[in-house]
Amino acid sequence: MTKANMQRQDTRYVALLLALAILMLLVPRVSAAEYTASGATKFVFTDRVITVTEGNYTGYKIEGTELTINGAGTYIVSGSCSDGSIKVKKGTTGVTLVLNGLTLTSAATAPIACNKSTEVNLVAASGTSNTLTDSAKNNDDNYPDNADAENAVLKCKDGSQVTISGSGTLKIIANGKNGIKSGATTDEEGTASLTIRNVNLTIHAPVNDAINAEQTLNIESGTTPISAADDAIHSDYVLNIG
């Protein structure tokens, strides 16, 4: 890529960010109840294990530093882990996943993956800072032997309906490919959508897109500083802002 092309891309991103900033100022911030902590099941990540405080919701499985959610409920995650992941099992609905001061890195896959036909509200809890990071290996173009590659830090697969909300902060660092990847609507998996609402979301994507959505992308409110090597925001179908 020539220096002139890089300058044109930088200008494009700056213009996009300015436009988004103006739109966000015009949209009133929503004051919504983020989640109900009472009865929630709580997890704390470390580099070696995940510890759990039982609540009312038992739809989960732990293997080492891998957490799988397979039942509806409110699940609160915190702590720090240099190689771990959270997955919401295919077809699981009614999930509220609360990031309550979580720093989660994955060495080969997506730190958080919402599998096909899931319904997930991902909440950055008030007063907390949360960071999700992947590695260069989370890219099956460059690492075709990595069967676990999801090509995004936050992967939302076909038919998934995911909302990112909360008054805390969420930082996404995409060393593999995309920051957030949202899948498609299909007859088999159902309707897909990604909604960003009332959250302080920062995305650094030095390899590809910051946000890549194959279906409906709703950016309703909040602040979203973005840097990306390719598209800051890419939507194949419908992009709604405000």
Predicted segments, located by residue:
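Generic low-polarity alpha-helical segments
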Residues: M1, I22-L23, A32
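Generic N-terminal leader/processing signal
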Residues: M1-K3, N198
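A composition-driven surface/loop motif
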Residues: Y13-L16, P28-G242
